A protein has these predicted regions:
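ABC family nucleotide-binding domain
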Residues: 1-141
Length: 141
């Protein structure tokens, strides 16, 4: 949209709410279940009620193929599954764009494809993504 983030009149906090971030190391909360990880930000920042946040989280977990893992803890998931939870968590804030910092570099090679499939589906749905990576397979997105 051509926003000048250096402009003193730019509401940087509002801009940050429009951009999601997915990190290399997932950064999931280990003492929260998968669904709680996805629900947390909308409840705390958008003041969404818990029932609505739970329903939205389950919808997003289904979108990344992990609805059946909603009530487990991150430590029980593979790296690829944890990264997909991180993607669902970023999507829970309904961003206009997603930033990915090496989304596949911490994964075993066999887990890379499941994360790439989610990213391809997001691209097909029109999600703007900025990806920093060394993974050449991502070029096809």
């Amino acid at each position: 949209e051509g926003k000048n983030l250096l402009d003193k009149n730019c509401d940087i906090r509002k801009f940050r709410e429009e951009v999601g971030m997915v990190f290399q190391k997932f950064n999931l909360f280990p003492l929260k279940t998968v669904v709680q990880n996805v629900m947390m930000a909308p409840i705390l920042t958008k003041h969404m009620n818990k029932e609505e946040a739970h329903a939205k989280a389950l919808e997003l977990l289904d979108k990344v193929g992990l609805k059946d893992k909603a009530d487990v803890y991150p430590s029980t998931l593979s790296g690829g599954q944890q990264q997909r939870v991180a993607i669902a968590r970023a999507l829970a804030m309904e961003p206009k764009a997603l930033l990915f910092d090496e989304p596949t570099s911490a994964l075993d090679p066999e887990m890379v494809e499941e994360v790439l499939k989610v990213m391809v589906n997001l691209a097909k749905q029109g999600m703007t993504m900025i990806v920093v990576t060394h993974c050449l397979a991502i070029r096809s997105i």
